[in-house]
Amino acid sequence: MTVKINTKDGLIELSDDVIATVVGGSATEIFGVVGMASKSAIKDNFQSLLRKENYAKGVVVKSTDLGISVDVYTVMSYGVKISEVSKNIQERVKFNLESQLGLTADMVNVYVQNIKVVGEN
């Protein structure tokens, strides 16, 4: 899916990867989020060998009638209040999509896939 924005100067196309990178970067800025949960272990392991950050892993972007919907799959730190961290993710993702890309997210669904104890490998 590509989001198309018509302006007076022309057309802007945003790929899912761009949107997912903004969403993943926004989520990992939040205190209590350790990282994004892997959706493709083989691809993610290959990228970790290349030492490349992949904020888009664990993000699914869908087009809706009102804008876009995003699913964010996270790994959180042990001991944090999951409901508060999730709410902060939703607010930050919506704000950053609007301010950076001019997109409205009508839904931001947060899925906690794992809890990591600090100091654990």
From Swiss-Prot:
It comes from Streptococcus pyogenes serotype M6 (strain ATCC BAA-946 / MGAS10394). This is Uncharacterized protein Spy1614. Belongs to the asp23 family. InterPro entries: Asp23 (IPR005531).
